[in-house]
Amino acid sequence: MQLTNKKIVVTGVSSGIGAETARVLRSHGATVIGVDRNMPSLTLDAFVQADLSHPEGIDKAISQLPEKIDGLCNIAGVPGTADPQLVANVNYLGLKYLTEAVLSRIQPGGSIVNVSSVLGAEWPARLQLHKELGSVVGFSEGQAWLKQNPVAPEFCYQYFKEALIVWSQVQAQEWFMRTSVRMNCIAPGPVFTPILNEFVTMLGQERTQADAHRIKRPAYADEVAAVIAFMCAEESRWINGINIPVDGGLASTYV
């Protein structure tokens, strides 16, 4: 993968998929600026400690990022067992706010990679709602929209992964045509990460056991990270506006 001298920002860098993505990117010559609320235990070229759940924390992080970058990997996220407002803020509103704010810093030919989920696969059932939310400009404005269009707490994780997929696909081509910056989603299935058990709790034993029979095993974080890194590389320069499942075939079993 051609990543030498590319300067890439990775959120959620201190654990799981984010940490593995940073390792893969650096192994291929990229310069990695990590962002996380927790201190990392891996080697990075730079690190910004930040809380991405509110605009003030995001603005503080942005002020410490380079003026020119080549990519943004939005990997920070919280499971559906977290407070529903936190899920909305981190997994969607904050991600969108950060991405829109740093777009002007991403150089032509750059790439944005958003980590969605196979749990967002039912986005067509709520397409118009997701498009409407995606058109809302601003973090607090998004919160206001959600107050008018509340999401059931037990469904919030799936809902905001759906919303992320729709926003990414709707927005990607307009940005690419105007700035030559691509945006795509990577949709993991179950992954061996520190929060895997949280997803088991969120989905329940019945759904978890049903899905377990559909795949050989959960993914290892580096298997997802390799695809994220590829989407930042020159070799993927003509891929834009798609959502790529990295799930060992899980999504295909629902066809």
UniProtKB/Swiss-Prot annotation:
This is Coniferyl-alcohol dehydrogenase. Belongs to the short-chain dehydrogenases/reductases (SDR) family. It comes from the Bacteria. The gene is calA. The lineage of its organism: Bacteria, Pseudomonadati, Pseudomonadota, Gammaproteobacteria, Pseudomonadales. It catalyses: (E)-coniferol + NADP(+) = (E)-coniferaldehyde + NADPH + H(+). NAD(+) binds at G12, V13, S14, S15, G16, I17, D36, D51, L52, G77, Y157, K161. It comes from Pseudomonas sp. (strain HR199 / DSM 7063). GO terms for molecular function: coniferyl-alcohol dehydrogenase activity. The active site is at Y157. PANTHER family: EG:BACR7A4.14 PROTEIN-RELATED, ZGC:101858.
